[in-house]
Amino acid sequence: MTPRYRRVVLKASGEALMGKQGFGIDVSVVDQIAADIADALSLGVEVGVVIGGGNIFRGVAVASKGGDRVTGDHMGMLATVINSLALRTSLAKIGVEAVVLSAIAMPELCESFSQRQALAYMDAGKVVIFAGGTGNPFFTTDSAAALRAAEIGADALFKGTQVDGVYSADPRKDANAVRYDHITHDQVIRDGLAIMDTAAIALARENNIPIIVFSIHEAGGFGAILRGGGHCTIVDDDPAAQQQASA
């Protein structure tokens, strides 16, 4: 079958990798994400991945306690490299070739990012894991995911979250929260819906990249959406889709 998208970037938060632990990496969660990526590859989809570092370190936590935000963000970038290496290991266990490209140079551990190299690896059928955020402080890994998606010409940016789409409020706290099947980038920004930071959403909008919000914890969910089904919210500016969703 023909997948809905041919080239995608998958963004997963560092917190998602913790599973039910309070810190660090739950290998079973990383293995599940790896299996979902392998499923996408079986459809002929080219996959890039960005993982946050919040399960290990968050730069804003340093700043909130009076520390230097720049140093804190640099520490957070290192955490994303750890998570990226963990995912590469899980992919290798199931025979999937993956390469980690980092925005910060650390040649003993991984290659440095370049758009040309990323595209070459994806054309060769390898998973490309983008580590180190954007390489600059004050930018989130959500912004890094949107940036990499634009750089490689991705058809969509998949945002794996704790819930199965975009809601008007946190459904885990508000029983009256309304789930959206389809919503625009502008509405997400205007209503302050906390799926990604504003810079990431604006970058996706400017480059006509739809954001697919789904549950990272639903095994097989990634592939189901690529096959045209699944549970998700599509964030884009397609007027026809908006009209259909509101009908």
Curated annotation (Swiss-Prot):
This entry's Gene Ontology molecular function terms read: ATP binding; UMP kinase activity
Is Cell inner membrane one of the keywords UniProt gives this record?
no
Q: Where does UMP bind?
A: 53, 73, 134-141
Query: Where is the protein found, in the record's own terms?
Result: Cytoplasm
The UniProt entry, under CDD domains, shows: AAK_UMPK-PyrH-Ec (cd04254)
Pfam families per record? AA_kinase (PF00696)
Q: Name one GO biological process term.
A: UDP biosynthetic process
How would you summarize its activity regulation?
Allosterically activated by GTP. Inhibited by UTP.
**Per the record, which residues fall in region Involved in allosteric activation by GTP?**
19-24
Q: Which UniProt keywords are given for this protein, alphabetically ordered? A: Allosteric enzyme, ATP-binding, Cytoplasm, Kinase, Nucleotide-binding, Pyrimidine biosynthesis, Transferase
Superkingdom is: Bacteria
Gene Ontology CC entries for this record: cytosol
Q: Which NCBIfam families match?
A: pyrH_bact
Family, per entry: Belongs to the UMP kinase family.
Protein name, UniProt field: Uridylate kinase
| Source organism of this protein record | Chelativorans sp. (strain BNC1)
